[in-house]
Amino acid sequence: MVMGLHLLLLVFILGLGLTPPTLAQNDIRYIKFLDQHYDPKTKNGNDKYCEKMMRLRNMISPCKEINTFIHGNKASIKAICGNQNGEPHNGNQRISKSAFQVTICRHIGGSPRPPCRYRATAGFRNLVVACENDLPVHLDESIFRP
């Protein structure tokens, strides 16, 4: 029993040593990207939506100047980092081939401390993202593309 436990522990430790740390870091950056920008449930955000989401996502201490929420599915967003839904843009960035429904929340002045007030702009935009290991890790901008 003890020998089997030691063998299991050894296999686990070896597995940790063989996992590249960059994979775990990229997963964390991708999760942070989703936390800041992904909201599949809402289709059209308004000012109250922005104030609520910015508070729920902890982006109000200090008040974040601007944030874009993407209302699409994860597979389509991830596909920007590949050829299915993305193409090279400005060096190491990628731009989506298709437009996504988004809500852009802009801080409307006043104090950088809560309570934060936001103005919502909803629409369809192409996304410009930075990718690492085929995962989006930074939303650079959302643009109208002819």
UniProtKB/Swiss-Prot annotation:
Disulfide bridge map: 50-105, 63-116, 81-131
Top-rank lineage group of the source organism: Eukaryota
One Pfam family it belongs to: RnaseA
Motif mapping: Nucleolar localization signal: 55-59
Name this polypeptide is given: Angiogenin
Annotated localization: Secreted; Nucleus; Nucleus, Nucleolus; Cytoplasm, Stress granule
SMART domains: RNAse_Pc
Main location: secreted
Residues of the active site: 37, 138
InterPro entries: RNaseA, RNaseA-like_dom_sf, RNaseA_AS, RNaseA_domain
Catalytic activity, EC: 3.1.27.-
Leading EC class: hydrolase
Keywords: Angiogenesis, Cytoplasm, Developmental protein, Differentiation, Disulfide bond, DNA-binding, Endonuclease, Hydrolase, Nuclease, Nucleus, Protein synthesis inhibitor, Pyrrolidone carboxylic acid, Secreted, Signal, Stress response
GO molecular function: actin binding; copper ion binding; DNA binding; endonuclease activity; heparin binding; protein homodimerization activity; RNA nuclease activity; signaling receptor binding
Any one GO biological process: innate immune response
Keyword Signal appears in the UniProt entry: yes
Activity control summary: Has weak tRNA ribonuclease activity by itself due to partial autoinhibition by its C-terminus, which folds into a short alpha-helix that partially occludes the substrate-binding site. In absence of stress, the ribonuclease activity is inhibited by RNH1 in the cytoplasm. In response to stress, dissociates from RNH1 in the cytoplasm and associates with cytoplasmic ribosomes with vacant A-sites: ribosomes directly activate the tRNA ribonuclease activity of ANG by refolding the C-terminal alpha-helix. In response to stress, the angiogenic activity of ANG is inhibited by RNH1 in the nucleus.
Cellular component terms per the entry's GO annotation: angiogenin-PRI complex; basement membrane; cytoplasm; cytoplasmic stress granule; endocytic vesicle; extracellular space; nucleolus; nucleus
Encoding gene (name): ANG
Family stated for the protein in its record: Belongs to the pancreatic ribonuclease family.
Function: Secreted ribonuclease that can either promote or restrict cell proliferation of target cells, depending on the context. Endocytosed in target cells via its receptor PLXNB2 and translocates to the cytoplasm or nucleus. Under stress conditions, localizes to the cytoplasm and promotes the assembly of stress granules (SGs): specifically cleaves a subset of tRNAs within anticodon loops to produce tRNA-derived stress-induced fragments (tiRNAs), resulting in translation repression and inhibition of cell proliferation. tiRNas also prevent formation of apoptosome, thereby promoting cell survival.
